Amino acid sequence: MSERIVPSGDVELWSDDFGDPADPALLLVMGGNLSALGWPDEFARRLADGGLHVIRYDHRDTGRSTTRDFAAHPYGFGELAADAVAVLDGWGVDRAHVVGLSMGATITQVIALDHHDRLSSLTMLLGGGLDIDFDANIERVMRGEPTLDGLPGPQQPFLDALALMNQPAEGRAAEVAKRVSKWRILSGTGVPFDDAEYARWEERAIDHAGGVLAEPYAHYSLTLPPPSRAAELREVTVPTLVIQAEHDPIAPAPHGKHLAGLIPTARLAEIPGMGHALPSSVHGPLAEVILAHTRSAA
């Protein structure tokens, strides 16, 4: 395991790796406002033990990557997709299997459209298609209105987690406890959730960010890619896996089925009991479907 700072335009991105660099590369793209440590070390090692060179990185404005005032230095999903490619360049990787979670699933769709030559395969989980306006859906759900796209909007557990995240926490212990409570809500009751495990991971994330207690927030200011870009996904030819978490409160079923339907090469898998979180109870089945997909794409 080693660390590397890579340039992407005028920002620097922190990254690290697991496994043998001689193995096929797999890039992990985390969700919004989360650093690379949103991918637990234990999960990354499980993928590496399956024969992959696993690379993860801090998005700009998270962790140890460049952090600036978003209003003064705005960016969009095009830049975030270019960041992912810059990480591959920084590790000397021509093509990689790319796995995107939540906002990372949106980023990986943009990678598939704008940087398709860098992909060996594509995996997306806990996310939706480029034609889904999640921001508008959240607002409509909060007003008690149906979504305009006909798919279910974010569920009450997400709204509960959002309200919790907006509550102040005094001191490190309170901040860790708040984060653990958030993840317990988002994970749901379908799989075991270990508070102590998540507390340990959040302690790591805080240390990784230099002891800063406030969670990053810049990505809340992002504008989603134009919904019209979803039509371009019909041209994607890279082997694609879409993973639906059975109890995802942010992108509930059938969002995964809808996303898979946008890409001719996509197939759909479901992780029973899983919510919008990565407790160790889902690491085994999740790694199993990802490894099977990357091997079939080799």
From Swiss-Prot:
Keywords: Antibiotic biosynthesis, Hydrolase
UniProt-listed Enzyme Commission number(s): 3.1.1.95
Gene3D superfamilies tied to this protein: alpha/beta hydrolase
Pfam families for this protein: Abhydrolase_1
The reaction(s) this protein catalyses: aclacinomycin T + H2O = 15-demethylaclacinomycin T + methanol
Pathway terms, separated by semicolons: Antibiotic biosynthesis; aclacinomycin biosynthesis
GO biological process entries: antibiotic biosynthetic process; glycerolipid catabolic process
Coiled-coil ranges per UniProt: none
Catalytic residues (UniProt): S102, D248, H276
AB hydrolase-1 domain segment(s): 24-277
Activity under varying temperature: Optimum temperature is 37 degrees Celsius. The activity at 30 and 45 degrees Celsius is 58% and 87% of the optimal activity, respectively. Exceptionally high temperature stability.
Top-rank taxon: Bacteria
Cross-referenced InterPro entries: AB_hydrolase (IPR050471), AB_hydrolase_1 (IPR000073), AB_hydrolase_fold (IPR029058)
Transmembrane segments: none
Keyword Hydrolase: yes
GO molecular function: aclacinomycin T methylesterase activity; triacylglycerol lipase activity
pH dependence: Optimum pH is 7.5.
Quaternary structure, from the entry: Monomer.
Function: Involved in the biosynthesis of the anthracycline aclacinomycin which is an aromatic polyketide antibiotic that exhibits high cytotoxicity and is widely applied in the chemotherapy of a variety of cancers.
Family assignment from sequence similarity: Belongs to the AB hydrolase superfamily. Hydrolase RdmC family.
Name used for this protein in its record: Aclacinomycin methylesterase RdmC
Organism encoding this protein: Streptomyces purpurascens
